[in-house]
């Protein structure tokens, strides 16, 4: 059987430019779908690109290609944002997004980026607050696109209104919100969504798997190391909890919660003494 953590490490343990975003995103799902045929889903992405190419002349303008991309994804195949069950973890697994033709902003954006790349459009992800977007830089102008809403092109006024809806008018649009994010940041955000879902549902085993992947992606992620220690503690895996807490204090000795973690280590030592 495939080792999901080894596969994920192989997918992400390289420079940004060498990461295959589609493959890496699919490997996230291996912990939940151990028999997942990643190459089969990559082939389905390739087929979507073939269908887009068939609808557009090779010399077509960028907006023609975007129109063809939107037609194939959102009209022909019916991809759409899952507003009815937004926090279903399936929305965060790219294989399920492809299978069910629905997802959340970041997974639909990954699919959009990957299909676009295969037809020659170099789209980038945007870590817009509360709602992941993509953009295409064209002749000094950014075309901002919302795959969750069927590939709508967003003006700055649209984006300002979106922030208003998301944050009640307390957050103003800033240029930094439109900066591109790297592939590892996209994967980190995908894992962050799953982390929040499993934490809220108290699914400790799946939460532990996501934290393991997050630490593979970013070995020095101190918050993830601390949080994994807390999950281990709740699972009564005391040696692993102690190891993570000690690593956290080595990496972040002056963190605001460092004293709390030290106290947890003292409590752990007492528990281990009682067990023995």
What are these regions (language model features)?
Residues 1-276:
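A structural boundary/capping signal
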């Amino acid at each position: 059987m495939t080792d999901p953590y080894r596969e994920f490490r192989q997918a992400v343990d390289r420079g940004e430019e060498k990461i295959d975003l589609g493959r890496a995103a699919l490997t996230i799902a291996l912990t939940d779908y151990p028999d997942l045929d990643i190459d089969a889903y990559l082939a389905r992405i390739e087929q979507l690109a073939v269908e887009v190419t068939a609808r557009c002349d090779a010399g077509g303008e960028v907006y023609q290609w975007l129109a063809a991309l939107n037609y194939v994804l959102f009209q022909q195949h019916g991809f759409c944002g899952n507003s009815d069950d937004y926090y279903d973890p399936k929305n965060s697994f790219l294989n399920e997004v492809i299978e069910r033709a629905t997802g959340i902003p970041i997974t639909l954006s990954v699919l959009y980026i990957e299909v676009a790349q295969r037809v020659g459009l170099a789209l980038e992800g945007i870590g817009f607050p509360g709602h992941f977007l993509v953009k295409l830089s064209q002749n000094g102008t950014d075309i901002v696109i919302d795959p969750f809403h069927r590939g709508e092109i967003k003006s700055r006024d649209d984006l300002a209104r979106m922030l208003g809806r998301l944050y009640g008018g307390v957050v103003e649009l800033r240029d930094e919100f439109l900066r591109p994010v790297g592939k590892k940041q996209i994967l980190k955000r995908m894992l962050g969504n799953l982390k929040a879902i499993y934490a809220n549902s108290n699914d400790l085993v799946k939460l532990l798997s996501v934290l393991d992947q997050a630490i593979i992606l970013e070995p020095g992620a101190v918050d993830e190391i601390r949080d994994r220690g807390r999950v281990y503690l709740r699972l009564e895996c005391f040696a692993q909890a102690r190891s993570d807490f000690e690593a956290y204090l080595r990496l972040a000795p002056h963190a605001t919660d460092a004293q709390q973690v030290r106290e947890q280590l003292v409590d752990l030592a007492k528990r281990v003494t009682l067990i023995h």
